[in-house]
A protein has these predicted regions:
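Feature 926 captures the class I aminoacyl-tRNA synthetase adenylation module centered on the KMSKS loop
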Residues: 202, 400-460, 464, 508-551, ...
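Alpha-helical support elements that line or immediately flank enzyme active sites
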Residues: 56-58, 287-292, 501-509, 648
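Short, solvent-exposed turn/loop segments enriched in Gly/Ser/Thr/Pro and often Arg
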Residues: 34-36, 44-45, 80-91, 144-152, ...
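N-terminal catalytic cores of NTP/NDP-binding nucleotidyl/phosphoryl-transfer enzymes
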Residues: 31-94, 147, 156, 222-224, ...
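Short conserved beta-strand and strand-loop elements enriched in small hydrophobics
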Residues: 203-205, 250-257
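Non-catalytic terminal extensions that flank enzyme cores
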Residues: 1-54, 77, 340-343, 353, ...
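Secondary-structure transition/capping motifs at alpha-helix termini
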Residues: 68-76, 97-110, 130, 134-139, ...
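Residue patterns forming the tRNA-binding/recognition surfaces of aminoacyl-tRNA synthetases
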Residues: 3, 17, 21-25, 95-215, ...
Length: 892
């Protein structure tokens, strides 16, 4: 072979050029081809604000593994890429950029701001795509989409209008999660709950007597974590079955400070066992109170402005921040004698996942999706197995959300995003939902309209991603061929945001499931198990890892040991281990190529392996590999990607490199038998090429470079055929025989290590056994056994003829192996060495015992130091025992 690999593996030298080659040759591209079976997956579109992080790296590596695997299996594999406009995240980022330039969003106006936003998107929006390419992602970049491109915009408008026509979308006043910093509503899924130390304020409201006077002795007591919301109270509720309060139902209380009369109502929502069994009802600021208020026709009094200051309904507290108002109200209640006590209390507080501001439940006019009917097909699909969630335990999380679903608030008070296609008649206020600006008001005939200023929740457009990217609402050939998709790979943290919404959108718009399987992965945490975050400063930049170790090392690290749905810890040591594995493959490949001289340049095709003189070692490795192909393929088909690559890793490192290559070296170096050498080289090359194919989805760059250097028949490993299991390549007898030989070799190596035998020092090996299977294996593999065991000769016998007392022995399986002691070591030199070691250990033991028996040391030294010295005592004692035992043997 005239061409060989560079002496050392350098990822920087190969990765960029190989990726360019793949793109130039359109290996990632998929077109409709009815002669092939399609396999489709859509990329969870990363935000255009995004920079590649470890979560992206894991998510896209998993997808790339699946798409490369299916491509090699002959599927017409499409991985649909794209980016998300990320409404609120992008708007916040652009506002920050403008602030640095001294520009205020509102000074620009909506159109001016959107111009800046598109400029920003053009400059920075594609950054993460270039970073994904560095990872090796084999997406069809010719099909790259954006959630606000023309096609997606059309799909969003069509869905909104269709759902409004069906009554699924409506505008109404309901409780929403309001972010007072971002000044927008957010969905339940965008609220993060974190435990915070707070208080329960125990307050009492006085009873209004039948004559209208306010009682000074009769009160109803309750507790609240948000005393400022009392300004919006419109009732106090008790459970209808609570005997303590039955006489008070229908009575009136006086709301202190505000001096508003509140009815005492009965509602089963109230838990009699919690606190005093009394709940104040604030319909405009609590979702549960809102529902109670609807049942009892209570007024809804909003006390907050959009920035969470008190509005005019708060009377004298108007203009105060919510927390300042809280303090002032509590102070006044205390002065009035109506504050019973303050109790420390830890509770979950909802915060906006973007800006971490405490959200305010607030009644607002918003657009909603009615979920009660829409969600039913999504529930049934998972229940009946039409859509499979992996791991299965994710079903519990899925159903927990669907069982407690609320109507989805889809309007956002933002400018960047899909503007809601609703138009208000300037004359009569009639709302017209339409695919384009209406010409005439159907109610009054006016021709002037103003479009709703709000935009849609980012996840509204993302929910359409599996079919909008294929051309819907047009019935394109792509849509007919590639939809429904096969698998969705995503993090478990967006099951609510995205997965469920895609499922019900798929059934509602397409009448079928959007995908067959959802493969969930966990989070990538730091080595201590902590979530990576800016505040902790523990984030790890995958691009830095790629720059230092190569993309393949990062990919292998992220997948090895990874199980669906489980979080993983990231260790730099594991990346180094992955890099070492790459070096191992590289060096093994170079070794094989160096032995393929012009006389022995083995072609990849044109040789009938059945005609080769395969030795026992050849048949063993071929049989082991054949079994590996079946197991790995089964694992891949079951989405056990971490298990699959661990098996490939173990096979290449252990069976192929550490054992088989060592087994065939005598045949390569010393054999004059051309046919024997040809069989060895063919086996080496064949197994390596096919092992590279199994590894390719995980480590695409190094496998491509070696594959294309090792053979010339195929232009790229990524479009080569995935190996298939063949029963003809099962060699059970030879496989078992080599395993017996390996066990015997391990025993011999252990003895040599204990005796400190110099590497390469040869000695006679006597194997005493009456086990015919072992004898046959050693006969068939005598050359292999002798080489691996450093045996000058191998003597097989059934009895102890010729065995002397000065031989060392080891019992392995059904055999005893003997080696002449004098052939292994120079006894005098070994005794001298061990006597020196005995003296050194004696000194160490004296020192450690002295410290541990020293009262001052034991009382003042840190616990860790004392523990360290105790560990040394155990270690040195064990070493001394071994040295003494060895000396006793030698002196005999």
């Amino acid at each position: 072979m005239s061409e060989n690999l560079e002496k050392t593996y350098n990822p920087k030298a190969i990765e960029a050029k190989l990726y360019e080659k793949w793109c130039d040759n359109k290996y990632f591209h998929a077109e409709v081809d009815r002669s092939k079976k399609p396999f489709t997956t859509v990329m969870p579109p990363p935000n255009i604000t995004g920079k590649l992080h470890m979560g992206h790296a894991l998510d896209n590596t998993l997808q790339d593994i699946l798409i490369r695997y299916k491509r090699m299996q002959g599927y017409n594999a499409l991985w649909q890429p794209g980016t998300d406009h990320a409404s609120i995240a992008t708007e916040v980022k652009i506002i920050e950029t403008l602030k640095k330039q001294g520009i205020d969003k509102h000074d620009l106006g909506r159109e001016g701001f959107l111009e800046k936003a598109w400029e920003w998107k053009k400059e920075y929006g594609g950054r993460i795509i270039e970073q994904l390419k560095k990872l090796g992602s084999s997406c069809d970049w010719d099909r790259e989409r954006f959630t606000m491109d023309e096609g997606c915009n059309k799909a969003v408008t069509e869905v909104f209008c269709k759902m409004h026509e069906k009554g699924w979308i409506y505008k109404g006043s309901r409780i929403v999660n309001w972010c007072p910093v971002c000044n927008t509503s957010i969905s339940d899924a965008e609220v993060e709950y974190e435990e915070q130390a707070g208080h329960f304020w125990h307050i009492k409201y006085p009873l209004i007597e039948d004559d209208g006077s306010v009682s000074t002795t009769k009160f109803i007591e309750f507790a609240t974590t948000r005393p400022e919301t009392m300004l919006g109270d419109t009732a106090v509720a008790v459970n209808p079955d609570d005997d303590r309060y039955k006489d008070l139902i229908g009575k009136k209380l006086l709301l202190p400070i505000v001096n508003r009369e509140l009815p005492v109502i009965a509602d089963s929502y109230v838990d009699m066992e919690f606190g005093t069994g009394v709940v104040k009802i604030t319909p405009a600021h609590d979702p549960n109170d809102f529902e109670v208020g609807k049942r009892h026709n209570l007024p809804e009094i909003n006390i907050l402005n959009d920035d969470a200051t008190i509005n005019k309904n708060g009377g004298k507290f108007e203009g105060m921040d919510r927390y300042a108002a809280r303090d002032a109200i509590v102070k006044e209640l205390d002065e009035m004698g109506l504050l019973v006590r303050i109790e420390d209390y830890s509770h979950n507080v909802g915060t906006h996942d973007r800006c971490k501001t405490t959200i305010e439940p607030m009644i607002k006019q918003q657009w909603f999706v009615k979920m009660d009917e829409l969600i039913k097909p999504a529930v049934e699909a998972v229940k009946n197995g039409e859509i499979e969630l992996i791991p299965k335990r994710m079903e519990k999380t899925y159903f927990n959300w669907t069982d407690n679903i609320r109507d989805w608030c889809i309007s956002r008070q933002l400018w960047w995003g899909h503007r809601i296609p609703a138009y208000y008649c300037d004359e009569c206020g009639e709302i017209v939902v339409a695919r384009e600006m209406p010409k005439v008001c159907p109610k009054c005939g006016c021709t002037h309209f103003t479009q709703d200023p709000d935009t849609l929740d980012t996840w509204f457009s993302s929910a359409l991603w599996p079919f909008s990217t294929l051309g819907w609402p047009e019935q394109t050939e792509d849509l007919k061929y590639f939809y429904p998709t096969d698998v969705l790979v995503t993090g478990y943290d967006i099951i609510f945001f995205w997965v469920i919404r895609m499922i019900f959108s798929g059934y509602e718009q397409m009448g079928e499931r959007p995908f067959k399987t959802v493969l969930f992965h966990g989070l990538v945490r730091d080595s201590q198990g902590r979530k990576m975050s800016k505040s902790l400063g523990n984030g790890i930049d995958p691009l830095e890892i790629i720059d230092k170790y190569g993309a393949d090392a990062l990919r292998l690290t992220l997948i090895t040991g990874n199980a669906p749905g489980n979080d993983m810890r990231f260790y730099y040591e594991r990346v180094e281990s992955s890099r070492n594995f790459a070096n191992k493959i590289w060096n093994a490949s170079r070794f094989i190529m160096m032995n393929m001289t012009e006389d022995f340049d083995i072609p990849s095709t044109g040789i009938n392996p059945q005609e080769l003189q395969l030795a026992i070692a050849d048949k063993w490795i071929l049989s082991k590999f054949n079994r590996l192909v079946k197991e790995v393929t089964d694992n891949m088909d079951s989405f056990e990607l971490g298990i699959a690559v661990q098996k490939v890793y173990d096979f290449i490192w252990d069976e192929f490199c550490d054992w088989y290559i060592e087994m065939v070296k005598p045949r390569l170096y010393n054999s004059d038998d051309r046919e024997n050498k040809t069989a060895a080289l063919w086996t080496l090359k064949s197994v390596l090429i096919n092992a590279l194919k199994l590894l390719h989805p995980y480590m695409p760059f190094i496998t491509e470079e070696i594959f294309c250097t090792l053979q010339s028949e195929e232009e790229s490993i990524m479009i080569s055929k995935w190996p298939e299991y063949q029963t003809a390549w099962n060699f059970e007898r030879e496989e078992k025989g080599i395993e017996l030989i390996k066990e015997a070799v391990r025993g011999i190596r252990n003895v040599r290590t204990k005796m400190n035998v110099a590497p390469g020092k040869k000695a006679s090996v006597y194997v005493v056994t009456d086990n015919q299977e072992l004898k046959q294996a050693l006969e068939d593999g005598r050359l292999v056994f002798a080489s691996l065991a450093c045996a000058s000769e191998v003597i097989l016998q059934q009895d102890k003829t010729g065995i002397t007392d000065d031989m060392v022995s080891v019992v392995i399986l059904n055999a005893t192996i003997y080696m002449p002691f004098a052939e292994l070591v120079d006894i005098r030199q070994e005794i001298e060495r061990l006597e020196k070691e005995e003296k050194r250990l004696s000194g160490e033991l004296a020192r450690v015992n002295g410290m541990l028996n020293n009262e001052r040391f034991m009382s003042k030294a840190p616990e860790a130091k004392v523990a360290e010295e105790r560990e040394k005592l155990v270690k040195y004692s064990q070493m001394m025992e071994q040295v003494k035992e060895r000396l006793a043997q030698l002196r005999k």
